[in-house]
């Protein structure tokens, strides 16, 4: 039951404390490892389509496996010193694998700037949590970007890490974070990463396939509990859940669009280039700053449901098996 207790404690530590700036975070070191491995692998493999695919596949194998093995070894060694030390370490990494408070804090900063009618400040705030160009977004565009980020990252930053933490503790949770970090750094379809980043992007799609779909239904239930349009959320999810280049990203975005009766996604600028993207949802009313609070209520409610559901399933399986 150590894993269940560590996940429970880690979740509420994240919910209350978020990620303090002074605390070293595993994702930072994963990012440094990705950069170093990319340089090394690009030197070792030929600069051809096949060579770049092989180099990217090597990265996609080394980083997640290495993250898992290092975490498992450190927890094991800590347990040899004292079981409490192993539990504290596992709790710490469970805490750091989750992003409930971070999502809430960053997105609500955007809401605050919009309510103050500080559009430049709102653009700067949303630029911290999205990959698109934000300098020309209007107020509705800024709010929409924040809503999309909270919806998508509920799966990537909360439900999926919880899913893997409950299955395999901190080692598997950090393995997932390594996959997710790789995708965010090299999983682009541009000249530099089209081939090198393909394995990382595909691995991220596989790792998120089940959690993303669970997340969609958790968000629907949360929409019902928070007074949003749960029926419309299901209808839009059923229609628009694949309106994205990723098979997973629109799963929760479509639920958010339906629950809030708004239109999300569509064309956006990335690195100075317009990227054509399908829309998600229906334009039943304008997007507003208050929708950021609404999606956060849904996200936090869905996070709590996920915690209870996943831990309950683990406990039942432990008893039966």
Task: For each feature predicted by the language model, list its residue ranges.
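Hydrophobic alpha-helical transmembrane segments
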Residues: 1-175, 179, 187-321
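Glycine-rich phosphate/dinucleotide-binding loop and adjoining beta-alpha-beta core of small-molecule
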Residues: 184
